[in-house]
């Protein structure tokens, strides 16, 4: 039985062709060769159609939500994707073990792997997707570009074939002239992509892109294209029966991106001239017909003014497919199943309509205030809106976010009559979403939605880069109010557990507190640490009405909390009333109010140990990951800013740079080894230790 909690849909998605159940040609059972939210989402459609489902998991995902939701899962290897989700033999063996007739690849991993599609068919199973020949022609971006040219679709100038030779790629870059884009030939999703605007460090950028492409897709080949600045990313959802019949399900706007990864997607595209829209839709369908496309796919374009250029075809289900489902009412996963089962296209072109506007936001485990560094750990608390929004997720409270896979935790999808209404609906839903235990981009997304350019749909693909200062929180700009609320919560917990007067509790200070002139304790009782700052907390005695004056450094704030239900409280902060959610896990306190989410660590003052004397030459891992490359050896001389170690986490490369000039005195890890967050990777002895 598939749990409805895996993915909630408040606005129903109608089934193709009138919600038909499993037809005579439909599969009895399939295997989903994926994980996380997409595995849960595919399983939901299968349940509705009466199709049984099995799946696979790595050792890191043994207790993952998709395993619980689907109920039947086969372990296929270790935590790294190369040892599990990318193992073709293990996936096919799992399908046979569970009695599946077909395999749905989802997106990522093996979804665009020609060898996998061929192996599935060779094993007597059905691959739910395009033919292996189509994947081969489109999975390689250079080959896809040749197909587009043959179909009469305009393309971006660039290399004609992929290359794994760094020197050859470097030569192409110099011939095209800057700026250019390096792209992994074998896949998308922002992996193996680099925007190049300077020749400085070009060799390192090429090598890094190749490593990332190899790790993500098993192929290090790159292509080079001219980079079109300030363009819009428009893509068309197509579906074909394999016999030359191809339709479109209208377009999506995917312009709001960071590091070439989409964050906000919507359908239809706003402010797109009708004539331009029709030409783009027609070109996408014409290319699909030339390919005799089977299944669903996405034709991507870059739009600059009234001109547009073909980028690539993704021969698979897209992360952002829900926005198309919401405006067309067509279940795209069901369409994939019916086409693969030989039932043909579920609808005709003149039966496809676009109603209203849908917008999707991707919530990721990453810290926008720290260069979007991925965040890993246990999710202490997860809660999404209970109604009025579509939620696709693969996590729940107590889920573990590991460094081995993509950082996306959930997608929220709003659907309304107008774009403005959908934007407002999505913003409210993000505000009601609580994810504690890792740092997320939730507040960043809300600020992005509020930008005038976003509201007016006058954006381009570099908007986030250009407005990054307005989208991230300035380090050191501590907000005292959520800290005061967290401090009040902590004190009340102390009172409840100490069963004595907190001013005499040995767990706090060890001596009788005397009142200070300002009514607060004469010394700080609590030290609160946040991601980028810290504060000293002093308390005044609890008042008869339950309120308390709390000092956050030099700021005094009056706070009162009244329990509502579970982790919800009515908070009065300096006479302003609002509903907040507060969760505590060990010493971590998570406060979520209508405007922001704040994580803090509570350290009673006498246990507080200053970190000011830490050796600045210690190079620590910013998060759990795998060492890819060591650039130094013991005795190497480095300067501040020199990259010493290259790590990979969540399929993205991280470079650890020396903070000082000096000499390397220790290197504690080797390439291929896993490093825990905050572990000392190497040590640099500074040339001069500050006095």
Residue ranges and their predicted role:
Residues 542-547, 551-568, 572-578:
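Conserved nucleotide-binding/hydrolysis modules and their immediate coupling elements
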Residues 609-691:
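Structured functional modules or segments
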Residues 577, 583, 587-622:
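Catalytic P-loop NTP-binding/switch module of NTPases
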Residues 22-299, 303-321:
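N-terminal beta-alpha lobe that positions the nucleotide/phosphoryl donor
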Residues 284, 322-551, 555, 643, ...:
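Catalytic cores of soluble metabolic enzymes centered on carboxylation/carboxyl-transfer
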Residues 4-15, 25:
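Short amphipathic, helix-prone segments within low-complexity/disordered or flexible regions
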Residues 198, 240-245, 303-306, 385, ...:
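Short acidic-glycine loop/turn motifs at beta-strand connectors
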């Amino acid at each position: 039985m598939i749990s409805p909690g895996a993915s909630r849909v408040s606005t129903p998605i109608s089934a193709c062709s009138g919600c038909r159940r499993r037809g005579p040609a439909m599969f009895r059972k399939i295997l989903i060769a994926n994980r996380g939210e997409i595995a849960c989402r595919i399983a939901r459609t299968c349940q509705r159609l009466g199709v049984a489902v099995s799946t696979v998991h790595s050792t890191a995902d043994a207790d993952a939500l998709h395993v619980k939701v689907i109920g039947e899962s086969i372990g296929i290897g270790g935590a790294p994707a190369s040892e599990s989700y990318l193992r073709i033999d293990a996936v096919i063996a799992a399908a046979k073990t569970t009695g599946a007739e077909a395999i749905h690849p989802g997106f990522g991993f093996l979804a665009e792997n020609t060898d996998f599609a061929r192996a599935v068919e060779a094993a007597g199973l059905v691959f739910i997707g395009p033919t292996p020949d189509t994947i081969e022609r489109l999975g390689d971006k250079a080959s896809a570009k040749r197909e587009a040219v043959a179909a009469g679709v305009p393309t971006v100038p660039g290399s004609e074939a992929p290359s794994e030779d760094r020197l050859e790629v470097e030569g192409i870059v110099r011939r095209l002239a800057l700026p250019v884009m390096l792209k992994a030939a074998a896949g998308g999703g922002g992996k193996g992509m680099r925007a190049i605007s300077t020749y400085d460090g070009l060799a390192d950028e090429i090598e890094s892109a190749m490593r990332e492409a190899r790790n993500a897709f098993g192929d290090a080949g790159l292509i080079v294209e001219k980079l079109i600045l300030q363009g819009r990313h428009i893509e068309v959802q197509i579906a074909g029966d394999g016999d030359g019949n191809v339709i479109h399900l209208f377009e999506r706007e995917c312009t709001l991106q960071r590091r070439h990864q989409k964050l906000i997607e919507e359908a239809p595209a706003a402010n797109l001239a009708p004539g331009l829209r029709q030409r783009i839709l027609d070109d996408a369908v014409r290319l699909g017909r030339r390919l005799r496309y089977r299944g669903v796919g996405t034709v991507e374009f870059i739009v600059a003014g009234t001109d547009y250029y073909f980028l690539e075809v993704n021969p698979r289900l897209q992360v952002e497919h829900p926005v198309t489902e919401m405006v067309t009412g067509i279940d795209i996963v069901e369409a994939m199943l019916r086409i693969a089962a030989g039932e043909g296209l579920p609808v005709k072109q003149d039966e496809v309509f676009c109603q209203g506007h849908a917008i999707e936001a991707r919530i990721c485990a990453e810290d926008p205030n720290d260069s979007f560094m991925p965040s890993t750990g246990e999710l202490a608390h997860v809660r999404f809106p209970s109604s009025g929004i579509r939620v696709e997720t693969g996590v729940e409270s107590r889920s573990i976010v590991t460094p081995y896979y993509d950082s996306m935790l959930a997608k929220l999808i709003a659907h309304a009559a107008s774009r403005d209404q959908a934007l407002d609906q999505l913003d409210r839903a993000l505000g009601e979403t609580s994810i504690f235990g890792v740092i997320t981009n939730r507040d960043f997304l809300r600020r992005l939605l509020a930008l005038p350019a976003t509201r007016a749909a006058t954006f381009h693909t570099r908007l986030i880069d250009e407005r990054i200062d307005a989208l991230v929180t300035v380090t050191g700009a501590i907000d005292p109010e959520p800290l005061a609320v967290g401090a009040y919560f902590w004190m009340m917990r102390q009172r409840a557990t100490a069963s004595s007067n907190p001013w005499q509790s040995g767990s706090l200070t060890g001596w009788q507190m005397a009142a200070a002139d300002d009514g607060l304790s004469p010394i700080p009782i609590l030290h609160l640490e946040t991601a980028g700052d810290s504060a000293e907390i002093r308390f005044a005695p609890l008042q008869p009405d339950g309120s308390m004056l709390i000092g956050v450094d030099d700021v005094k704030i009056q706070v009162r909390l009244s329990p509502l239900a579970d982790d919800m409280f009515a908070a009065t902060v300096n006479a302003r009333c609002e509903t907040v959610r507060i969760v505590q896990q060990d010493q971590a306190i998570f406060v979520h109010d209508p405007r922001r989410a704040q994580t803090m660590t509570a350290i009673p003052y006498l246990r507080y140990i200053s970190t000011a004397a830490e050796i600045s030459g210690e190079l620590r891992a910013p998060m759990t990951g795998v060492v890819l490359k060591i650039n130094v050896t013991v005795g190497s001389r480095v300067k501040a800013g020199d990259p010493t170690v290259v790590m990979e986490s969540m399929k993205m490369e991280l470079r650890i740079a020396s903070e000082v000039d000096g000499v390397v005195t220790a290197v504690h890890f080797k390439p291929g080894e896993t490093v825990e967050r905050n572990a000392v990777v190497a040590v640099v002895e500074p040339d001069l230790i500050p006095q």
